[in-house]
UniProtKB/Swiss-Prot annotation:
PANTHER family: DIMETHYLADENOSINE TRANSFERASE (PTHR11727), DIMETHYLADENOSINE TRANSFERASE-RELATED (PTHR11727:SF7)
GO-annotated molecular function: 16S rRNA (adenine(1518)-N(6)/adenine(1519)-N(6))-dimethyltransferase activity; RNA binding
Organism from which the protein derives: Lachnoclostridium phytofermentans (strain ATCC 700394 / DSM 18823 / ISDg)
Family: Belongs to the class I-like SAM-binding methyltransferase superfamily. rRNA adenine N(6)-methyltransferase family. RsmA subfamily.
Disulfide bridge positions per record: none
SMART domains reported in the protein's UniProt record: rADc
Organism ancestry: Bacteria, Bacillati, Bacillota, Clostridia, Lachnospirales
Name assigned to this protein: Ribosomal RNA small subunit methyltransferase A
Length: 290
């Protein structure tokens, strides 16, 4: 079995299997042991944990996970990586299940039920940057029982997840993530920690899921419609953003009245509102729609 974690071993494995990186899968393998160890520490993995790894690649981080967790479920979309994982890099571990599937099509709740009795799991991943948001939001919206999600993402995306009102990075993603979890940037990771090197900076972010939502809202679906509409046309006022949104078909007068009841100026932009204010606005509009 090849023990991974530095460029030399990674290259040996790739050459042995004549592996070719596929751009469509956003493959950038981690080759820095310090970063790998930091991810494991940040996720606070113990021998009691079931860990879901998304996109194990050649199994570099999976090896660390197998040595620290009770059980690992690794979901890999690229069929060309499965022989490497099963026959080589993970062959000596008996606590890992490899699933060759698109993570967006996997019933993770069923896995949690079968393998962890429905108790919260931990999610660890070096995520493909082109589908970071769909993966994370998919986990949230499916209400998968999760303790924390510790993932490598594009630096710009990590900044957006952690940003607050009024900052240039604050947006719909910030609010959505913060509704479900408490984000914390663990480390910034330069391109030379990957093979091949990405063209952007990266960051490890830990999302610790809230046991209870930080705000109470009667209509969660409406809340997220309002948030998306407010940032679709970022430079417009909140009122114009909501009035122009195809998702929200409400009379202009109703929107104006709701903003007035919220107690903010009529010219305010969505980027100035907190999560609490969006929740209050959703409740006001929900009441008016009845």
């Amino acid at each position: 079995m090849a023990y991974l974690g530095d460029p030399k071993q990674t290259i040996e494995v790739l050459n042995r299997y004549r592996f070719i990186f596929q751009k469509k899968f956003g493959q950038n393998f981690l080759i820095d042991t310090h970063v790998l160890e930091k991810i494991i520490r940040s996720a606070e993995i113990t021998k009691d944990d079931l860990v879901l790894e998304i996109g194990p690649g050649i199994g570099t981080m999976t090896q660390y996970l197998c040595e620290n967790a009770r059980e690992v479920v690794a979901v890999e979309i690229d069929k060309n990586l499965i022989p490497i994982l099963e026959q080589d890099t993970l062959s000596s571990y008996d606590n890992v299940t490899i699933i060759n599937e698109d993570i967006l099509k996997v019933d993770i709740n069923q896995i949690v039920k079968e393998k962890n009795g429905g108790k919260p799991i931990k999610v660890v991943a070096n995520l493909p940057y082109y589908i970071t948001t769909p993966i994370i939001m998919g986990l949230f919206e499916a209400h998968v029982p999760i303790d924390n999600i510790t993932v490598m993402v594009q630096k710009e995306v990590a900044d957006r997840m952690q940003s607050g009102p009024g900052s240039k990075d604050y947006g719909a993603l910030s609010l959505a993530v913060q509704y479900y979890a408490d984000p914390y940037i663990v480390a910034n990771v330069p391109p030379n920690c990957f093979m091949p090197r990405p063209n952007v900076g990266s960051a490890v972010i830990r999302l610790t899921l809230h046991q209870d939502a930080p705000v109470k809202v009667k209509n969660e679906n409406l809340l997220f419609k309002l948030i998306r509409a407010s940032f679709n046309q970022r430079r417009k006022t909140l009122a114009n953003g909501l009035n122009n949104s195809p998702e929200i078909s409400l009379p202009k007068e109703m929107i104006s009245e709701a903003i007035e009841e919220l107690g903010v100026v009529a010219t305010i932009r969505g980027e100035a509102l907190t999560l609490e204010q969006f929740a209050k606005l959703a409740d006001i509009i929900d009441e008016k729609m009845k």
